[in-house]
Amino acid sequence: MKRRSPIFRMMVLLLGIALLFGGCAPEFSQNTQGNSSTLEAMAPTVTPSASHFPVQSETPAEPVTVEGEITAVRRSSFTLLLEDGTQLTVIPSREHMEDDELLQGNRAQVIYCPQERQENQIKALQVTVTVPEAYAQVEKLLDTMTLEEKVGQLFFVRYPGKKAPEEEARYQFGGYILFGKDFQELTKGEVAAQVEACQKEAKIPMLMGVDEEGGTVVRVSLNPNLRETPFPSPRELFKQGGLTMVTETEAEKCQLLKELGINVNFAPVCDVSQKEDAFMYSRSLGQNAQVTGDFVRETVGVYREENVGCVLKHFPGYGENGDTHTGVVVDRRSYADFLEEDFLPFREGIRAGAGCVLVSHNVVTCVDDEKPASLSGEWHRVLREELGFTGCVITDDLVMGAIQDYCDASSAAVQAVLAGNDLLCCSDYSTQYPAVWEAVQKGEISEDRVEQSVRRVLRWKVALGLL
């Protein structure tokens, strides 16, 4: 075989380099204009070969522009939700990932090279982030609020019955959660009137929530005046008619809640449970992680279309564990188990644009073997960084047995804020509000920390059309 000369081999190498950079692979430069931050790409430079042979390269593909809503923001990428429901994973430059405006709900225009697209992952040539005007008003509203009002916004409390309007006028709570007895024997008009009475006392419109999962956990549809029969569980509906029947029922559920003035449902249950004797099985879809993830994604889509808030629960996932209502539950599964199974439905819900995630009281040892997840800063870091969630994080009820066995109610509320929760779900606000207020007054909880959470709460209210 004839041996090729070194000059010939060099020319082949140069030809390969020219072809490699003949597409639209960018270098990056930063450009900021007005309220939009822009990341621009410089055209690649290719030095012509000194060879006598002409260098041939493919004509670069025209860049493609897409626009959508930012949902999840991870360390080196973010999710862009397009109008048709497509979810794109966008990989921008390192500099742009540090942009403070890269938040759930903001808009982004992304320019990318179609040659470098891998399924639904794109490498950005340019990213322009825009803050919708409604979100821009949040900062102005924060400037007008007293510190007491800001602390009040952190509380999503148990509806206190007839004195609910009076208590809202006093504390300016972020929201009320209603239970079955709050709807007993009432008509739709009577429920709506009670809710409206509370909203009239609120300087900032309230989140009004219920647990209307379907099946064993229903608050509204237990009352035959509000629905002829209680909503079935998603697990039962899925067996009967797949995801189509599930989403149709969720849409009906949203319509009923809106008639009553309820704007948040503490659902869907994202826990993966397939053992019939497990505590969470009857409330879960009863399917594997992939199918549960599909259910969560589709359900979140329905709630967004209906403009009703939903809450992904119970992060990081119960699995087949016991009941935290009655005492401490310890989960000793590996972190790999959570990555491969439990995180998947939460990740799907976050990427689909869910505005809130509820954190359970399980002690999950692979990340923190001392504190319940709800009070663990480490677990909140995982939720923010690993799953990319920038929306509201809420505790499970702070009077549940798992918390009472760990610490007292007042301490739990303070620890919950310090851990990173934005909203405290509590039935004992007369104890927990003063504890948080005192911690703020003493500087144990900084005003900056309070504002960080209030900002997220207000942004969620904007997303729901309350502001």
Spell out what each predicted region is.
Residues 152-153, 174, 203-208, 262-263, ...:
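Short, well-ordered coil/turn segments that N-cap beta-strands
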Residues 2, 25-31, 40, 133-167, ...:
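Preference for extracellular/luminal or secreted protein segments
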Residues 169-292, 314, 319-332, 360-375, ...:
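Enzymes and membrane/adaptor proteins characterized by extended Gly/Ser/Thr/Asp/Glu-rich
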Residues 28-83, 98-133:
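Short, flexible, surface-exposed loop segments at domain boundaries
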Residues 2-11:
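Bacterial N-terminal signal peptides that target proteins for export
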Residues 86-94:
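A short macromolecule-binding patch
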Residues 21-23:
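C-terminal motif of bacterial Sec signal peptides marking the signal peptidase cleavage site
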